[in-house]
């Protein structure tokens, strides 16, 4: 229901609105309500031998066609099979029954790609032995192409080279250092669907002899789901259950985003679901789980984790245009509560030698913070502090960030350092 605002001087009524300049999020379950297949368009008119040469020579010359890449990957990977030891289904689609032998492309629906196939340069010296490492190389370039940081890019490329050399000792990189022809491959929906299908298949068959192909595809899993990853990281760093962590959400914006992420029926907690690949399979163009669509949750969660000494949180991206003050206070209070209490309890005993706490003694002294992690107790205490961080809270935060060095701009680490280490 719209809220009206009245001008005092003349009682003019207005309804304040902002322009709708953002696309709404799209959920994977909604995709499958409209369609029961994921189409993959491949040109299958050329032989695997021809395609192998086209791709090899195209990579070396810097003029490879993504259509050739996709067609080659399909031809080289279509006979890889795995036997299911349980039924496999997702969003109402039956992928296979226990005992079935299935392939990578059973996860999608193959369609013929219309149009003229681009010309390619043949190479008769290429053999089927290349099919053991060339798909790994092509899929690995997807991961390399997703980062623009030179140092990390080189590290990934070196790792890819080592993976290929484990299969073929004579392997030499086909793409010269500094050439970025493969960076745009991620814009091709058929290529990303192959990447997603490969990763989803080998996630199910982790012990498959070709599972090393996941070196490049693993970043497809939970792509654009950074806020969801933040939630998982926060649960681990605090040692608290998902339910208990949720009770510590103290800001309306964070609560709204939590509701958005936890929409039922999306198979978030189903490991063999299509859901982790919602972006690369084309199930969603705007992920409900990204840091872009959940900036307040992402900031609050990563700041809390950082104040609990998480090394991973220091490089998390700092969102723009959020209500920093309240979110910072909420993150500080949560981290202080966890950091100043130890969730310790005897887990095993010999005979009946068990510790029994005496609940009749103790109790809070004036201004003393609670001893546990109950959000209700902490909020009551915080009210007594006039809802402002205490000097001890600020000192706790300073100790957490004072040793941080080499922080990148626009990161949570950089923000926390400037906020608390004054």
From Swiss-Prot:
GO cellular component, one term: helical viral capsid
Keywords, ordered alphabetically: Capsid protein, Helical capsid protein, Host cytoplasm, Ribonucleoprotein, RNA-binding, Viral nucleoprotein, Viral RNA replication, Virion
UniProt KW RNA-binding keyword: yes
Disulphide bonds in the chain: none
Family: Belongs to the vesiculovirus nucleocapsid protein family.
Protein name, UniProt field: Nucleoprotein
Coarse class of the protein's main subcellular location: virion
Function in brief: Encapsidates the genome in a ratio of one N per nine ribonucleotides, protecting it from nucleases. The encapsidated genomic RNA is termed the NC and serves as template for transcription and replication. The nucleocapsid is bullet-shaped with the tip containing 8 turns of a conical spiral before reaching the helical cylindrical trunk. Nucleocapsid assembly is concomitant with replication, therefore viral replication depends on the intracellular concentration of free N, termed N(0). All replicative products are resistant to nucleases.
Biological process terms in GO annotation: RNA replication; viral transcription
Any matching Pfam family: Rhabdo_ncap
Annotated region described as Interaction with the phosphoprotein, given as residue ranges: 350-390
């Amino acid at each position: 229901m719209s809220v009206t605002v009245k001008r005092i001087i003349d009682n003019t009524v207005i309804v304040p609105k902002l322009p709708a300049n953002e696309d709404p999020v799209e959920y994977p379950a909604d995709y499958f309500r409209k369609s029961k297949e994921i189409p993959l368009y491949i040109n299958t008119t050329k032989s695997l031998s021809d395609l192998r040469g086209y791709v090899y020579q195209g990579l070396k010359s810097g003029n490879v066609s993504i259509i050739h890449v996709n067609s080659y990957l399909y031809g080289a990977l279509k006979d890889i099979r795995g036997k299911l030891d349980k039924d496999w289904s997702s969003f109402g689609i039956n992928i296979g029954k226990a005992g079935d032998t299935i392939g990578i492309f059973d996860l999608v629906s193959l369609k013929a790609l219309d149009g003229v196939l681009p010309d390619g340069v043949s190479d008769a010296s290429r053999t089927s032995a290349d099919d053991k490492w060339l798909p790994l190389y092509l899929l690995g370039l997807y991961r390399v192409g997703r980062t623009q940081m030179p140092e990390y890019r080189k590290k990934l490329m070196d790792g890819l080279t080592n993976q290929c050399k484990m299969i073929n000792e004579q392997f030499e990189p086909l793409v010269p250092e500094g050439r970025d022809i493969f960076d745009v491959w991620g814009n091709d929906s058929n290529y990303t669907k192959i990447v997603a299908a490969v990763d989803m298949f080998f996630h199910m068959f982790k012990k498959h002899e070709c599972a090393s192909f996941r070196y490049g595809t693993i970043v497809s899993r939970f792509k654009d789901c950074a806020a969801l990853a933040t939630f998982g990281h926060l649960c681990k760093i605090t040692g608290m259950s998902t339910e208990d962590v949720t009770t510590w959400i103290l800001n309306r914006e964070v609560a709204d985003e939590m509701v958005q992420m936890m929409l039922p029926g999306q198979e978030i907690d189903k490991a063999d679901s299509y859901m982790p690949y919602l972006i690369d399979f084309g199930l969603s163009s705007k992920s409900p789980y990204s840091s872009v669509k959940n900036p307040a949750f992402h900031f609050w969660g990563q700041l809390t984790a950082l104040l609990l000494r998480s090394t991973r949180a220091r490089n998390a991206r700092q969102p723009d245009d959020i209500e920093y003050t309240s979110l910072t206070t909420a993150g500080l209070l949560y981290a202080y509560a966890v950091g100043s209490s130890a969730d310790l309890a005897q887990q095993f005993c010999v005979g009946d030698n068990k510790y029994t706490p005496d609940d009749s003694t103790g109790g809070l002294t004036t201004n003393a913070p609670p001893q546990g992690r109950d959000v209700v107790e902490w909020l009551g205490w915080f009210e007594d502090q006039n809802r402002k961080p205490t000097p001890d809270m600020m000192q706790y935060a300073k100790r957490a960030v004072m040793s941080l060095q080499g922080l990148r701009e626009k990161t949570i680490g950089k923000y926390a350092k400037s906020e608390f280490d004054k």
